C-alpha cells in the first residue's frame, strides 16, 4: 500500500516512522509519500491561503496548490479530506481502506478549505466532535488504524482480529504476571487451561464491557441466542 499525504507540515509525520509502522516502512510493507502543497504555489511568497470572500476571521486554503499537488500524483487511489463535518472514522472504514492499493489524505489548516476542494475528495472524514489546529493528527490516527491491519505489520496476525471493534464488541480484559497483585487476582478461568471456557469468558466479558461502556454498539448488533443469554446474566449480575 502507498499512502500519499498532502500537508503543509510533513515533519509532523515522523511518529509514523517508528515502532511497528516504522518497521513496516523499512520492510516495504507500505509506503508513505509526504507532499508539501506549498511547493505547488506560483507566487514569490508561496501563499497557500487567502482571506475569505464575504469577509470573516481567519484565512482559507486555496484550491490551486492542492489541485496541482493532487495532479502530480500518479496513483492517488481514494482521496480523503479530514474535516469536522465528515463522517466519523471507525474500525470498519480502516478495514475497508486497508484493502486499497493507494490512499491520499489532504490535511487542512488555518480557517479551513475553499469549499471547492471538497469536490476533489472521495470522502470527508472526522475523528470526533472537536476541532484541532490542522488535519495532520487525525490523518496520522487514521493511517495508524489502517496500516496496522496490513499483513506483516503486527507480530501476531491474530491481534487485529481479536481487538476492540473488530467483531462489533469492545475487547475483553487481559492480564499477565503476576497472578496475584496485592490481593487482586487473575480470574481463575484464565489459568485453567480450558480453552473453551476461556473463549466463553472472553466473549462474555467483551459483551459486558460493551454493555457498560458503549451500549450504542449493541443497538446495531444482531445478538445470537448465546449472547442474549450472556447479556441477561450480565444485567442480573449488575443489579445484584
From Swiss-Prot:
Record-level GO cellular component terms: cytosol
E.C. designation(s): 2.1.1.228
Sorted UniProt keywords: Cytoplasm, Methyltransferase, S-adenosyl-L-methionine, Transferase, tRNA processing
Binding site residues for S-adenosyl-L-methionine: 108, 127-132
CDD domains registered for this protein in UniProt: TrmD-like (cd18080)
Reactions mediated catalytically: guanosine(37) in tRNA + S-adenosyl-L-methionine = N(1)-methylguanosine(37) in tRNA + S-adenosyl-L-homocysteine + H(+)
GO terms for biological process, alphabetical: tRNA N1-guanine methylation
Subcellular compartments: Cytoplasm
SUPFAM superfamilies from the UniProt entry: alpha/beta knot (SSF75217)
GO molecular function ontology, one term from the record: tRNA (guanine(37)-N1)-methyltransferase activity
Quaternary structure (record): Homodimer.
Function as written in the Swiss-Prot or TrEMBL entry: Specifically methylates guanosine-37 in various tRNAs.
Family: Belongs to the RNA methyltransferase TrmD family.
Protein name per the record: tRNA (guanine-N(1)-)-methyltransferase
